[in-house]
Structure formats: structure tokens, C-alpha cells
């Protein structure tokens, strides 16, 4: 949930500015975010692992195998999804209401608040999409978190572990709880 809050705050703002502003390379940035929506989580985990490993550029922070590393990996996974989907909704809303905003000379921040309020339900759906991607993620979380009991073990990694150990009933029970979330 922390990863969703952190990444969505910045992603919605970036999606908003991509929708409203015209600038050089805008289309390339949009294509990049759309492509990153499908990045394999294991690749994200591997990149974060290399960054946070002892010999990596951020190794001095000693974040590997901590919940913070898991939040970083999940934030990176969620970020392009929320940027791309919020860009789409804001660009549609902007085309619909652009003349009204310009006629009343509403500033950028006021425009953002109005568009967020107008598309609130869709934004909640976007956030739930990001949350679903984060909560169902196994690979990146296992790589950077280490699946340490009572510290970095989450439901998806626990399901994987219990299945490998042959505790299929317990793994299925965890899976049902995960679906109900």
C-alpha cells in the first residue's frame, strides 16, 4: 500500500502535465511509459537488486532485503501504469473542458483539482489497477526482499513458499484470502 501511495502521488501529477502541456519529445515519453506498463516485475527486481546490492551505487544505504527495497520495487512497477492511465483520462477530460478552463482563466493547479474531482471514480479505478499489480507481484519482491519470515514475507511469496514445501491447503487458503483482498 505504501508503494501505491508514493508512486501514485507523483504519477498522477506527471500524467496530468503530460496531458496538458505540449513539449518536445512528449510522444516519446508517452510511448515509453506505455511500454513500461508491461515490464516484467522480475526485471524490475533485478535492476533494484543491482542498485541496492553491496557493490551497487546505492549499496551504502543497506536497503537490500528490507521492506524499503520492496516498496521501491513495487513503486517502480506501479509508476508507469498510473502515469499512462492517468494521462489518458486527463487528456480526454482536457479536450472536453479546455475551452471552459481558458474562458475562466483557471490556473494550472485549479484545473488539476477540477479534473481530479471530475474523474475521481476513474482515478480510483486506476489506483486499484496499480494496487492489483503490486499485491499480486512475486518476483521483484522475492528478489529484493528475500522472503524473510516476519520481516519481508508477503502473501504472494508465502504462497510460493508453501506450495514448494507441499503445504497446498495452506497455500490455497492464502490464495483465497489474496483474492478476497
Q: What function would you assign to each model-found segment?
A:
Residues 1-91, 118-138, 171-181:
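Membrane-water interface segments at the C-terminal ends of transmembrane alpha-helices
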Residues 85-123:
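Short cytoplasmic-facing helical segments at TM-TM junctions of multi-pass membrane proteins
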Residues 142-180:
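Interhelical loop and adjacent transmembrane-helix boundary motif
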Residues 14-15, 45, 98, 141, ...:
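Interfacial helix-capping/hinge residues at the ends of transmembrane alpha-helices
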Amino acid at each position: 500500500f505504501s508503494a501505491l501511495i508514493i508512486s501514485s502521488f507523483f504519477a498522477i501529477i506527471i500524467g496530468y502535465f503530460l496531458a496538458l502541456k505540449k513539449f518536445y519529445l512528449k510522444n516519446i515519453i508517452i510511448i515509453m511509459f506505455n511500454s513500461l506498463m508491461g515490464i516484467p516485475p522480475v526485471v524490475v527486481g533485478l535492476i533494484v537488486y543491482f542498485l541496492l546490492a553491496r557493490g551497487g551505487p546505492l549499496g551504502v544505504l543497506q536497503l537490500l532485503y528490507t521492506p524499503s527495497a520492496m516498496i521501491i520495487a513495487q513503486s517502480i512497477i506501479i509508476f508507469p501504469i498510473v502515469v499512462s492511465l492517468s494521462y489518458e483520462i486527463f487528456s480526454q477530460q482536457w479536450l472536453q473542458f479546455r475551452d471552459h478552463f481558458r474562458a475562466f482563466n483557471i490556473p494550472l493547479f485549479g484545473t488539476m483539482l477540477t479534473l481530479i474531482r471530475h474523474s475521481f471514480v476513474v482515478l480510483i479505478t486506476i489506483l486499484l489497477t496499480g494496487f492489483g499489480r503490486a499485491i499480486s507481484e512475486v518476483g521483484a519482491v522475492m528478489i529484493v526482499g528475500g522472503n524473510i519470515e516476519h520481516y519481508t514475507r508477503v502473501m504472494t511469496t508465502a504462497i510460493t513458499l508453501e506450495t514448494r514445501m507441499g503445504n497446498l491447503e495452506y497455500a490455497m487458503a492464502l490464495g483465497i484470502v489474496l483474492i478476497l483482498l
